[in-house]
């Protein structure tokens, strides 16, 4: 196993590159949010209400939304269906969650999303159509969903860079070789 499994391939198919780019962003985001207590996860910068805890919960929602409703039309499930109160609910409500809950929510959503996206790729490939449509009923392709996830992570991994630096000074583009997120005492992924 590679010491840097999040690195995209140097030469590979379009699908391998898209999945590699997504996993690199996921890993970098998770590294930026890793190993913090409640205070660290709720740190804000200036007038912004963004926190690493809010980003963990928001990106868990995005992973579940993309890999259920948009991918297959399957209901998104809990906790997203019954707790939704307002547009920024995932960001705001994260203040009520423990670090363990936030990490488990994100880790679980990513694992589910990977499995669902892998199944869709095995079934129809990158050119397969998904449930999501435009206003005229035109169906989106799986490639679009992967690009949407990459865009979302690109935006929020940049936010996470700034937030984490404000918490404890951690900077850098990639986790150190061999890094794995910890849940309790066991590595994840």
Task: Give the residues covered by each predicted segment.
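Short, contiguous alpha-helical
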Residues: 4-8, 15-88, 130-189
